[in-house]
């Protein structure tokens, strides 16, 4: 019955005509549902009264190898208010162990979308049609909720592969299929005073380094800008593991200065969220300093209803509905797209075929 509901949902929405976005009017665009692209602190707060959010995000599949890093870095750690730290996992389908996705969710971490195929080349994502993005992203939302047995409504965020923007289309799919925010868009120009998350009701002022970027009015679609770091040679890098230069691996003081210098650019200015955007291998090779961490969706929730840091720290910790994992080990399943054999570790019944683009549940 659940699969029938999901299938009906995926066929119920059609692409709509879009209007060109105009310059943002702060008097018309107000929280909680609209925000102009801006470096101003939400709610008119002073920096000293604003929480400094730090978001640690990981891309790609979750498996028995990289989960060991996640357990070591994230489990049994709390922020200064004694609430558990939260990271965001932008998960791609291939080679993902959905039992481990369920484990991460039950530990309070955010599960978000990174496509089913993660196909190459990046130019595919730049030109992908509405239907292609729907099959990769909207279908993945129901796929990951089903196979990891996590609440459908808790899957809120998207990051497209290779940070390749898709213009208006991906945001239209995101809006049509109940996704709240996108965290794909690099921000390399606005780094001294970073952009806070904003909506696409009106035209964005964010620089477009990996076009095409959205130009339409897409009410209620949130952008979480990926504010670039600056490497030791002064060059911007969005994914920290893609910086062209690094401190010496054996010099912990240099690494500490590298991280703190980038952090202070946020903390000593307008306290825009400080993003630590990486793949798992980087953390396992270069362990991070201890810091307070929240998820990307936590940041969006605060921006929609900003409160001073004293009030924020006094709030009760979030609670999450725990979900069971009726474990199944499935395979080998031969994939039709490449003829490779896969094993799947799921929190649901085994599919008849290897799930893939166009057949996210692996139905006959």
UniProtKB/Swiss-Prot annotation:
**Factors inducing expression:** Up-regulated in response to 20-hydroxyecdysone (20E) and juvenile hormone analog.
For this chain, the annotated S-S bridges are 24-36, 29-34, 83-317, 208-213, 237-243, 325-347, 330-350
- Report, as the record phrases it, the tissue specificity of this protein: Expressed in midgut where it is found in the peritrophic membrane, a semi-permeable acellular matrix which lines the digestive tract (at protein level). Not detected in foregut or hindgut (at protein level).
Q: Which residues form the signal peptide?
A: 1-15
Question: Which keywords belong to this entry?
Answer: Carbohydrate metabolism, Chitin degradation, Disulfide bond, Glycoprotein, Hydrolase, Metal-binding, Polysaccharide degradation, Secreted, Signal, Zinc
First-tier enzyme category under EC? hydrolase
The record lists Zn(2+) as bound by 60, 114, 118
What is one cellular component GO term in this UniProt entry? extracellular space
Q: Where in the cell is it found?
A: Secreted
Q: Which GO terms describe its molecular function?
A: chitin deacetylase activity; metal ion binding
Q: What is its main location?
A: secreted
Which superkingdom, per the lineage? Eukaryota
Catalytic activities: [(1->4)-N-acetyl-beta-D-glucosaminyl](n) + n H2O = chitosan + n acetate
An annotated GO BP: polysaccharide catabolic process
Residues covered by the NodB homology domain? 52-292
In the Enzyme Commission scheme, what number(s) does this protein have? Answer: 3.5.1.41
Glycan attachment points: 168
Q: Which cofactor does it need?
A: Zn(2+)
Q: Which PANTHER family match?
A: CHITIN DEACETYLASE-LIKE 9, ISOFORM A, PTHR45985
- Similarity annotation: Belongs to the carbohydrate esterase 4 (CE4) family.
| Function comment | Hydrolyzes the N-acetamido groups of N-acetyl-D-glucosamine residues in chitin.
According to UniProt, the name of this protein is Chitin deacetylase 7
- Gene it is expressed from: CDA7
